[in-house]
Amino acid sequence: MAAFNFEAFSLTPQGSTISAAPRPAAPAIDRTVQQQCGSFGYGNRAFQFDFASLESLPEDANPGLTEVLTAKYWNHFSIQLGHWNTLKVIVLDAQMFSIMPDHTKKGVLNTMKSYLGGADAMYARDADNGQVVILAPRRLMESNITIVGSTTVWDPKKRHVQATAEAKIPRPPNAYILYRKDQQAALKAANPGIPNNDISVMTGGMWKKESPEVRAEYQRRASEIKAKLMSAHPHYRYVPRRSSEIRRRAPRRNRAQEVANASPIGENSGAPIVGNPIVTTMEQQQPLPDISIAPNQEITKDNDVSHLIDPPHVFSGQITELMPDVANFLPPMIREGWSPLHDFRAVLNGHTGNNGVDCALTPESESQDDFVGTPSSTMPDNSAFDWITGTEEDLAQIFGQF
């Protein structure tokens, strides 16, 4: 914010003209206050202003001048009070504030109170920025105020830190905690660099082996500490930390251990992965039957593999039951009693069909070296076959020479 160098004005006795008057000389700086303000990074003259002194100002000698200056300053400051400023906080430049006459400061403060509907307002120095003075409702700043020297300082963060520190009451230690604390120094001296976890394990074993007299003594000490705490804080109640606040270190250690113990790829490639549902399911399945046939082996009743193929009616019956009209559009391969091996069983057994359909290949197909025709010239003419009324024998005759 730019610094405005307003001169101090005074009215003539007649009140008709306004003349400029020189500013009074600045008083000597109070070094004690300056040192106190130094902790906040301040030390200028403006910071020494006693905001509380506005309540006990002497009578204004020039009320007309105060009214004019109050209007000028308020018009400049009130620009910040838009609808976006829900807290109704005005930020003033410290240098501008330092040259404002005291009665003008009080006039701006009273105007702010009127703007707030009669609610009390106050000035305060911002604890984070020494060049800023805050004018805001008292209810907003009063609980966050710190007095430095004679100056009011608004420091919300300090209040939050103090409130947190006051609310945190340490949990009274039990007998074992006191015992561990007494043994920790000796264990560390005897075992340099020992981790705290190992100390806990060692002291736990030592505590179990201690005599009843020693354990009773630590129980007595723990009871005394708890009694003192309850006397100082009668309403104390231990509240465990939420699970989200606990640092989950154990799962990370477990995952790191799993990675370290994992065998490289290929060492146990035949072993199933534990907990893998896919591997477990595959292990429970029966091995698939071997339906392979030698290249020159004929399909006979002894080695017929059609029974290994799902019966066609398993799917064809479901289709026709759900959609009766679809049966008119299905080729004979989907009819009941048909399997993919039926049409070629006769071919492999050397049969050529019953109705004498000539399926001889064209001359172009007799020798692959002399092939000059189109690919369609090597295929049998099956365009006349009726896929709706045709039989398996008709289809077998068409492909009988293959």
Swiss-Prot record:
Annotated region of DNA binding: 169-237
CDD domains for this protein: HMG-box_ROX1-like
BP GO annotations: cell differentiation; single fertilization
GO cellular component: nucleus
A Pfam family annotated for this UniProt entry: HMG_box
Subcellular location per the Swiss-Prot or TrEMBL entry: Nucleus
Region (Disordered): 246-272
Keywords for this protein: DNA-binding, Fertilization, Nucleus, Transcription, Transcription regulation
GO molecular function, one term: RNA polymerase II cis-regulatory region sequence-specific DNA binding
Domain of life: Eukaryota
Function: Controls fertilization, probably by determining the mating type.
Protein name, as recorded: MAT+ sexual cell fertilization-promoting factor
Lineage of the organism: Eukaryota, Fungi, Dikarya, Ascomycota, Pezizomycotina
